[in-house]
A protein has these predicted regions:
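Active-site-adjacent structural elements that line small-molecule/cofactor binding pockets in enzymes
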Residues: 1-155
């Protein structure tokens, strides 16, 4: 069983009781806590990104669909419904969302975001395209990202 962790305590629990770790932030201390507690299984990272032909459009989409992601797990875990998520993130700008969601048409930008997780010790990467433009992202992935990732040409 894979266990999601947003903090060291949960990562240690995943190391003791789970078969794998899942995270959404490139924090090396979570992999360290998982391993120090006996975890030897895969370490999965969900990497949020938003592809669009223009960086500004990607930021706008990420803001519309994923602005709550900047609040972090300690806040998100306490929010009971969608209205609460909206209230907790009403002040978040598209530029702020772009600090946690890789946005735009640049393969290098997305590869850098992925590499932060690889450098933090995650060995399985889950790409999450934010917003409704899944087909465009899949085309971009096929043309620009897949070979670099498969060849481990992550900067």
């Amino acid at each position: 069983m894979a266990i999601a962790a947003g903090g060291s305590k949960a990562a240690r629990f995943a190391g003791r009781k789970g078969d794998a770790l899942i995270v959404t932030e490139p924090r090396a201390e979570l992999t360290e806590a998982f391993v120090s507690a006996g975890g030897s299984g895969p370490r999965y990272a969900e990497v949020a990104m938003c592809y669009a032909q223009r960086k500004e459009d990607a930021q706008k989409t990420a803001h519309q669909y994923f602005r709550w992601s900047v609040t972090g797990w300690p806040v998100m875990a306490e929010l009971p419904d969608t209205d609460s998520f909206a209230a907790a993130s009403w002040h978040v700008s598209p530029e702020t969302v772009a600090q946690v969601v890789s946005c735009g048409p640049s393969p290098e930008r997305h590869l850098e975001a992925i590499n932060r997780y690889v450098q933090a010790g995650y060995d399985h990467i889950i790409l999450v395209q934010v917003g409704p433009h899944q087909g465009e992202f899949l085309d971009f992935f096929e043309r620009k990202l897949a070979s670099a990732l498969r060849d481990r040409k992550v900067p």
